[in-house]
UniProtKB/Swiss-Prot annotation:
One of its GO terms (cellular component) is plasma membrane. It catalyses: fluoride(in) = fluoride(out). Signal peptide: none annotated. This is Fluoride-specific ion channel FluC 2.
Length: 120
């Protein structure tokens, strides 16, 4: 039950943060708010996992806050809208920014946490 409460509190915080960031205006038809929440969320998720944080931190931050903060469904919907509008160049750019940006964020979090934990 304790984990459920941590996830619920974290999820509410993450959803509110995402709501605020989603107000950012698109840049060249790219939904910047969605890309930012996914890249930032993936990076922070990696930091918590790679640092082997205690279970309560994992449930509160990764499952709760970052689960409520990141949004694959909005990314998918926005990308589909670009497809419907036959804006294929923007669609591919949006996919690339979200996926590659998120993967780079995880990689950088791995490098950062490894350097911190090894003192190097």
């Amino acid at each position: 039950m304790e984990h459920l409460i941590l996830v619920g509190i974290g999820g509410a915080v993450g959803a509110m943060l995402r709501f605020e960031l989603s107000k950012l205006r698109p840049v060249r038809s790219i939904p910047l708010g969605t890309a930012l929440v996914n890249i930032i969320g993936s990076s922070l998720f990696g930091c918590v996992v790679f640092s082997r944080s205690p279970g309560d931190i994992f449930y509160l931050v990764d499952v709760g806050i970052l689960g409520g903060f990141t949004t694959f469904s909005t990314f998918s919907f926005e990308t589909f809208r670009m497809f419907e509008e036959q804006d294929y160049q923007t669609m591919v750019l949006n996919i690339s920014i979200n996926l590659i940006g998120s993967l780079i964020g995880v990689l950088l979090s791995f490098i950062l946490v490894t350097l911190i934990l090894t003192g190097g």
